[in-house]
Amino acid sequence: MKLQRFSSLPLLVVLLCAPASAQTGDIYSKKSVRAVMQKVFEWQVAHPVEIDALNNNLWARAAFYAGVMSAGRSTGDRRYFEQATRWAESRNWKLGDRPRHADDHAAGQTFLELYVLRKEPARLANTKSVIDAMVAAPRPGREDWWWCDALFMAPPVLARLYAVTGDRKYLDFLDAMWWDTTDFLYDPSEGLYYRDKNFLNKLNANGRKVFWARGNGWVMGGTVRVLQRLPKNHPTRARYVKLLQTMAASVARVQGEDGRWHPSLLDPAEAPVPETSSTGFFTYALAWGVNNRILERKTYLPVIRRGWAGLVASVNEEGKLGWVQRIGLAPDKVTADDNQEYGSGALLLAGSEMLKLK
């Protein structure tokens, strides 16, 4: 596959002007990757984003802790698990207030992974109760998971509930919902997802289809996190694998030359700036695909390495990850000062897979 990357001189200048710590030494060494992960983790915990603590944005912090848990597993550093436990305890191991809203389910990913580490009933009870009620009264995916971000928020919770209970009803529900949402929002001609119905059959001011980078990052990250718990013999596993492969090819073609993706995947001119939350999720998904022999190493390793370099260049000396598009629903402007917890979570997910690359 021939990869076509968008070139932008301002982005190259940004990369060249990145902190010296991001450009010295081997940024791909395990020591360096661990150091960047720890620095970003520590800075983000010390500088919580105020709005992320609100219930209606519980997902933003939940996405951070998905990365924290992954970092704990990949590094063996229990400080990640300890911090995740403190957060879960502050939530009383409870999901958000909206029982059918995927955003309010995202925290369950961390709760369930902590339950595996210590099987205390309180760690499982609320997540299982909320999801059981939803499974008992199913609706189409396009109704409950009507925006593509939802495919990161809720499906990995269902996959993890299956893993801890062995009850296939969670996989059956996940599968039906996922593919109905996909039939609704996926554009097979582009191998990408629209954010929601408002972008179907709609062109931007430049006459291009609008595929939001972070939205597709959510989908690729969610696909990986479902595959992690989906049995090898599951009847539709090959379909998830094919989806990951197709999306990987689509996003690789539009990677910026500095390694970071633009907010609008098919039209970098719509928002001609780098965006790091999408870069983190794409790098994570591509690296996981290579590590699990789903994606071709020769094709994707250069893409992954550029993605990681772009992320590292976006971390300042203190550990703040910049260039994270704010909470929104479409491509938008981003600055070097913009930070959100889900961006740091995406970097931790990517770093966790970078540590496994050979």
Model-derived segments and spans:
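Helix-capping and short linker residues that terminate individual alpha-solenoid repeat units
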Residues: 45, 49, 76, 92-96, ...
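Extended ligand-binding clefts on enzyme/binding-domain cores
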Residues: 148-152, 159-265, 272-283, 295-326, ...
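Polybasic, low-complexity, intrinsically disordered segments
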Residues: 19-23, 242
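N-terminal secretory signal peptides that target proteins for export/translocation
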Residues: 1-4
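Conserved H-X4-D acyltransferase segment
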Residues: 68, 158
